[in-house]
Amino acid sequence: WYRGKFTDYKSVSVKEMKQVKHFLHVEWGGDSHARRHAEDPFKSLGGIPAGVGADERAGDFSLVGGDARASRDGDWSESYIVKLVDWHLKEQETMTWLTGTAYWPFKDFSTPLRPENPVPYVNQKGVIERDFAKKEVFYVFQSYWTQKPMIHIYGHTWPTRWGAANEPKEILVYSNCPAVELFVNGVSQGIKQRNSQDFPAAGLHWKC
């Protein structure tokens, strides 16, 4: 979120893991405006280099100055953060040496330390809002960790998509079910098998 591309997560973690006896990854995540969505959340992130590390440096939290980074240049959309979290969880599934992780934080909260944020004095890294309304990223975690069967189509607060006429749109479904069939206007778009290593949405993604 503050430096590098999230797709470098595992390679960076492996490098750091080799320097310690036990590896616990805490305080990971990123901000997202509830109800802000994007057809291409990566559009403004082309200037961020890959493979150069992910260490946080002084001033990285600021919205001005410094190197290209998602926290400064991104759109803070729910569309971006679900993919960041999905990628981390996908990778953690195969990181058997990982002692544990702690996402930061559970809920958006007020803070005097963020007067410059787009919503002043609010840290928006939570998976739920301050009134406990669930953000989209809540369902990403649920699809990996809950035992009770669940299913959620991304974008319940995004009723109107945009783009060219008849342009195919990405549909993401978060579920812990072994297989999911998607219907659009009563027509089946096919059955897909859940596979945590098939990014995004553990293979439950369609273009239609």
Model-identified regions with their sequence ranges:
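Substrate-binding/catalytic cleft of secreted carbohydrate-active enzymes
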Residues: 1-133, 137, 141, 148-162, ...
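Short proline/glycine-enriched turn/loop motifs at strand-loop junctions of beta-rich domains
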Residues: 174-179
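Long, low-complexity serine/threonine/glycine- and acidic-rich segments characteristic of extracellular
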Residues: 151, 180-208
